A protein has these predicted regions:
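Catalytic Walker B motif of ABC-type/P-loop ATPase nucleotide-binding domains
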Residues: 153-156
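Conserved catalytic motifs of ABC-family nucleotide-binding domains
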Residues: 149
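Conserved ABC ATPase "signature" region
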Residues: 57, 106-123
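ABC ATPase NBD coupling module
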Residues: 58-75
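Helix-to-loop junction immediately C-terminal to a conserved catalytic motif
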Residues: 41
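Conserved ABC transporter NBD signature motif
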Residues: 49-57
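Conserved ABC ATPase signature
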Residues: 128-132, 136
Length: 225
């Protein structure tokens, strides 16, 4: 509700994320882009419609099955800073592996270490989250979302609080994930992500407008290893 009246945060939309594609949705604060991402991530149930992942309606599943589907197929970079303070930076990045299998899976630690190197956090692997700056926490969240090589990556303002160099690094990692076959969605109010996109859409007052295909103009990804 707003001012005592009902309103739609997101108007009806039919949106498809394709494997190997990086889609950017741009919009101002309050435009509805983060609400849309939250619905796609299984965080906020829509009042109407469905979110289909591999043909399964995420919100029609029992809670345990929906949670398993999210953990297995979706990597989320949430808005703000999310970390377990009792764990080290490396352990936070490894969390998706532990949540999925109850134990750390083989090979995941090595990938986590590579990702931390990619976001320039390797020297802080043993640090606690409260020792990190806001920008460092954002970069940790990028590594955590990618550690299990999810089929779908949903990134809410992934470059918020990052300087230009670190923003480029985060976006290159998301671009690499798309090039390796993931369907990647970035919602942002900033311009930089557009240069890494295959497709750009604009959201305003809950309405999603079609944009252009841009892959030909996206910068080449540098090797992160």
């Amino acid at each position: 509700m707003r001012g005592g009246a009902m309103f739609s945060a997101v108007e009806p939309v039919d949106l498809r994320l394709s494997p190997g594609e990086l889609l950017v949705i741009r919009g101002r604060s309050g435009s509805g882009k983060s609400t849309l991402l939250s619905m796609m991530a299984g965080i906020l149930a829509p009042t109407e419609g469905a979110v289909l992942i591999g043909g399964e309606d995420l919100y029609a599943l029992p809670d345990a099955a929906a949670s398993a589907l999210r953990n297995e197929r979706i990597g989320v970079i949430p808005q703000g800073h999310t970390a377990l303070r009792s764990l080290s930076v490396l352990e936070n990045v490894l969390l998706p592996s532990i949540i999925r299998a109850r134990v750390e899976q083989e090979g995941v630690r090595e990938r986590a270490e590579v990702l931390l190197e990619g976001v320039d956090l390797a020297p802080l692997a043993d640090a606690r989250p409260d020792e990190l700056s806001g920008g460092e926490l954002r970069r940790m969240a990028v590594a955590r979302a990618l550690v299990m090589r999810p089929e779908t990556v949903l990134a809410d303002e992934p470059t918020a609080g990052l300087d230009a160099g670190n923003a480029q690094t985060a976006l290159r990692m998301l671009r690499r994930a798309a090039d390796e076959g993931a369907a990647v969605l970035v919602v942002t109010h900033e311009d930089e992500a557009v240069h890494f996109a295959d497709r750009v859409m604009v959201m305003e007052s809950g309405v999603l407008r079609l944009g252009d295909a841009l892959r030909g103009g996206s910068p080449a990804c540098e090797d992160l290893n």
